[in-house]
Amino acid sequence: MNLRVLVDNNTYIDRYFIGEPALSFFIEDREKRILFDTGYSHAFIHNAEKMRINLRKLHYIALSHGHIDHTWGLTDLVRLFMEAKGEKIDHTIPTVIGHPLVFNSKLFPSEGEIGSLLSEEKVNYHFPVHLSREPFWLTEKLVFLGEVDRKFDFEEDEPIGSVIIEEQYEDDYVVDDTALVYKAKEGLVVIVGCAHSGLCNIIEQAKMVCEEERVISVIGGFHLLNPSKNRIEKTVSYLEKLELQSLYPCHCTDLQSKIALARTGIVKEVGVGLNIEWK
């Protein structure tokens, strides 16, 4: 499997890509091409073109959850495919994969809508949509986890605004947050978007779904923005016990958390343009 970072908060020196506080990864495995999240704007398309990645040939668009920094680029992706149809440019019709609540409206008092700008219905006009709480295998080795069980008390979080479910406002604990997992030869690679479900919870879910205890790498947003001392210490302790080969914290992982995670001795730099391969 090959993974390239299309969008992150950071870009590399002398790599002239666009960064934004968002996330988007391009993944290739066994001739399948997957876009994991779409960032906040058109930046992922701009960066993909500079990397010579043809996003018109996707098989899946997998969404980690519904927040703006992971779904608002969908509008630009729809436009890309509309223009391909109009100009008769060769393209596929990818399937959108997500949790059943990924397109529900999410509201925050000071900002208004912080969920997807497009409803499931509107997305379905352009791409087939498959929403599932259960795991869904994208390839023989790459799985969309579905809804994540939240086991660890230290990863409990406050709600982020509200979510509208069946016309009712409910506290939003972002239960739509999920991840992808790749079954490499030496163990699991866990690919997270924002880890609202809790990084350790997600890894435990990955081990259960894949029936594999070995975990070799984790990449993505770890949802460690000003975490409590208890949370960061227990997270680091959990990760140390996994005996990982590499750790790629990015997006919603603040500097102090990265410094704490560096105790593992395996933290790697992440930025737009990063290209990683696992076998």
Task: Tell me the role of every PLM-derived stretch.
Residues S110-I114, E134-E186:
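Active-site-proximal loop/helix segment associated with metal-binding centers of metalloenzymes
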Residues A43-G98, C210-S217:
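Active-site metal-binding motif and surrounding structural segment of the metallo-beta-lactamase
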Residues D8-N10, T38-S41, G66, P100-V102, ...:
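Active-site metal-binding loops of divalent metal-dependent hydrolases
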Residues M1-M51, Y173, D177-V192:
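Conserved beta-strand hairpin/beta-sheet module of binuclear metal-dependent hydrolase folds
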Residues P100-Y125:
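Active-site neighborhood of divalent metal-dependent phosphoester bond hydrolases
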Residues Y60, G66-G73, Y173-A179, K183-G271:
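Cap/insert and terminal regions of metallo-dependent hydrolase folds
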Residues A84-P94, Q256-W278:
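Short acidic, glycine/proline-enriched helix-loop-strand junctions
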Residues R4, I97, P128-R133, V143-L145, ...:
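General small-molecule cofactor/ligand-binding pocket signal
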